[in-house]
């Protein structure tokens, strides 16, 4: 029936078909194959670097032509169909409110020379004060100076205005200097 030669040919073809030596493109198992990814040739499917800048120049010139044509046709559109410029106007109005306790005139005399700010603890000459507040704070008003401040010194930076408590504002100038008030326990009359 079968000849040994035919049997030998069929067995050789089966061995060659199942061998790892002959691979089809779809049957490669990559790193799980017997070769275990030891392929030192160029990476298949990777694009090679094209050094020719002539193609890049041509593509760049085509883009410039397209942009120029787009601008030309955009400028030919009616004004109503063109996109508006981005709005530059201020949509929120800022209302300036000065800080409490400060006047607008105070801002004018804060610094004459803005570039120079003295270090802390340094005093400037009288013709160029650090701030007007220094001049105003360290020279007390003569109205606020009382004779009793000699005996009592308030904390630094404070001025003391001695006024009596509410209901105790008495004017001693209106009373006579020789007035004598006496109460007697035995109902005697005073002179």
Curated annotation (Swiss-Prot):
Coiled coil: none
Keywords, in A-Z order: Amidation, Cleavage on pair of basic residues, Hormone, Neuropeptide, Secreted, Signal
Modification sites for Leucine amide: 44, 100, 120, 156, 166
Highest taxon of the lineage: Eukaryota
Signal peptide: 1-17
Major subcellular site: secreted
GO BP of this protein: neuropeptide signaling pathway; pheromone biosynthetic process
Role, per record: A hormone that controls sex pheromone production in females and pheromone responsiveness in male.
The protein's name in its UniProt record: PBAN-type neuropeptides
Taxonomic lineage from the root: Eukaryota, Metazoa, Ecdysozoa, Arthropoda, Hexapoda
